[in-house]
Amino acid sequence: MTQAAEADGAVKVVGDDITNNLSLVRDEVADTAAKVDPEQVAVLARQIVQPGRVFVAGAGRSGLVLRMAAMRLMHFGLTVHVAGDTTTPAISAGDLLLVASGSGTTSGVVKSAETAKKAGARIAAFTTNPDSPLAGLADAVVIIPAAQKTDHGSHISRQYAGSLFEQVLFVVTEAVFQSLWDHTEVEAEELWTRHANLE
C-alpha cells in the first residue's frame, strides 16, 4: 500500500482534486505556450514544407507526441516516416528530421540527428535547452521553456518529470499543422480521404 492510499486500500480522490489539477495543467500549458517564440515555430513550419520527406524521431512521451504530429502531416499530404518503424526508409539529402528532447541530450535522439546530418538531411528540433547537443545539430530550433524531466525541484512546473514539455510540444505541433493548413485551400473532406481505413 502506498502513502497515497487509505487504510482500506482506496485512494480518496474527490472532484475538487480533479478540478484543481485540470486548472493547474491548463494554466501551466497556457503560460508556457505563450512564452514560445512564434518566429522560431514559423521557421520550423517552413522547413516542414520544403521539398523532401519528413521523418520524426523521439523517445518516450515526446516520441508519442511526434507520432501524432506525423499523422497530421500525413493528413496534410506530406510523405512522413517514423524512425524505428519497420517500413521506414533511409533518410537522405533534402529530407527533414523532426526531433524532440526536453534535455536535448537523449542519446538515441541525438544519434538520429547526427546520422541525418551526415546524410545531408535538415534537422528541426524541439527542446528546453538551447545549449544542448541536439540544438547544436539543428537547422531550426524551437525552445519550449518547460522544466526538464530530471528537474524534480523546479519552480517552473508542479507537474511530474517532463509532462509540461510534452504537453506544450503537442500544442505547438498542432498549431504548426493548423497554420500550414490555413495557408491552403484544401477542404477538410480532402484531408479525411487520407485517414486510415484499416483499423
UniProtKB/Swiss-Prot annotation:
Coiled coil: none annotated. Its EC number is 5.3.1.27. Induction: By methanol or methylamine. Pfam families: SIS. Pathway: One-carbon metabolism; formaldehyde assimilation via RuMP pathway; D-fructose 6-phosphate from D-ribulose 5-phosphate and formaldehyde: step 2/2. InterPro entries: PHI/rmpB, SIS_dom, SIS_dom_sf. Keywords: Carbohydrate metabolism, Isomerase. It catalyses: D-arabino-hex-3-ulose 6-phosphate = beta-D-fructose 6-phosphate. One of its GO terms (molecular function) is 6-phospho-3-hexuloisomerase activity. CDD domains: SIS_PHI (cd05005). The active site is at E166 (proton acceptor). SUPFAM superfamilies: SIS domain. One of its GO terms (biological process) is carbohydrate derivative metabolic process. Residues 44-186 form the SIS domain. Substrate binds at S62, S101, G102, S103, G104, T105, T106. Belongs to the SIS family. PHI subfamily. Catalyzes the isomerization between 3-hexulose 6-phosphate and fructose 6-phosphate. This is 3-hexulose-6-phosphate isomerase. It comes from Mycobacterium gastri. The gene is rmpB.
